[in-house]
Amino acid sequence: MPLVAATRSLGRAGLFSLTVLRGSTPTADFLAELTREIYKIGARSLPIIAVGGAFVGLVLTLQGYRTLTTFGAADALSTLLGLSLYRELAPVLTALLFIGRAGSSIAAELGLMRATDQIKALELMAIDPVAKAVAPRFWAAVLTVPLLTGVFCSLAITASYFEAVHVLGLDNGVFWSALRNSVDFWDDFGVAMLKSAIFGGTAALVASYVGFHAEPTIEGTSVATTRAVVNASLLVLIFNFVLSAMLFQ
């Protein structure tokens, strides 16, 4: 039955997550692998995050300015930008871009390890494959996605500033003062970082679980990669709603 299968999969995913946490022992090998994964899934995601952030800022500024000028409230443009970015758009869009760039890579790598019997080889050598191959990827995602969200916000606000002030003619002081007065460090920026850490961990766990349990074939790896991106993206959107409902009451 579909319900039984879904419940079984959910239970396996929960046990897999506990295994990842249990295997997160900060040994020298673990820290070395963690550093490599931070570079692979974090630093290499910077270009797409930077470009995405800049163009989201430009689009928000353009559409927001047109809407606000209708009501004579163009001075509130940076308020709209800051609150929408930090509270919702930046964490979610960064996570979705991260899933497309790094989540698919994690699922494909682990699926290929399954297809080429590398996971079995680790088990035969009495090495926990989850601790070796999954835990560093999980913690790398938890650490890097908040940093990527910060980059996304910085580029979005910078691009918005240049468009609003130098193209649309908004006053420089008004832009920055409205942004400073509307965005709270803990309530807005802190929530963005919290969301990003949760989204990063969710993306890594889903991609790792699906890739780790993929069919040991090339087709199975392809299916697992697609499933990882879809499932992780849906969970990020669901968790974002739940967190927003809890944190912004």
Model-derived regions: residue spans:
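Final/C-terminal transmembrane alpha-helix of multipass membrane proteins
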Residues: T221, R227-S244
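Hydrophobic alpha-helical transmembrane segments of multi-pass membrane transport/permease proteins
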Residues: I48-Q63, V242
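Membrane-interface helix starts
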Residues: T25-V51, V230-S233
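Short cytoplasmic-facing helical segments at TM-TM junctions of multi-pass membrane proteins
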Residues: L110-A135, I218-T221
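Start (N-cap) of specific transmembrane helices in multi-pass transporter permeases
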Residues: D128-T149, A224
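Loop-to-helix entry region at the N-terminal start of transmembrane alpha-helices
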Residues: K40, R44, I48, G52, ...
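Membrane-interfacial helix-loop-helix connectors in multipass membrane proteins
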Residues: Q63-Y86, S154-A197, G201, L205-A224, ...
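Short, membrane-interfacial amphipathic segments enriched in basic
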Residues: P2-A32, V210-G211, E215
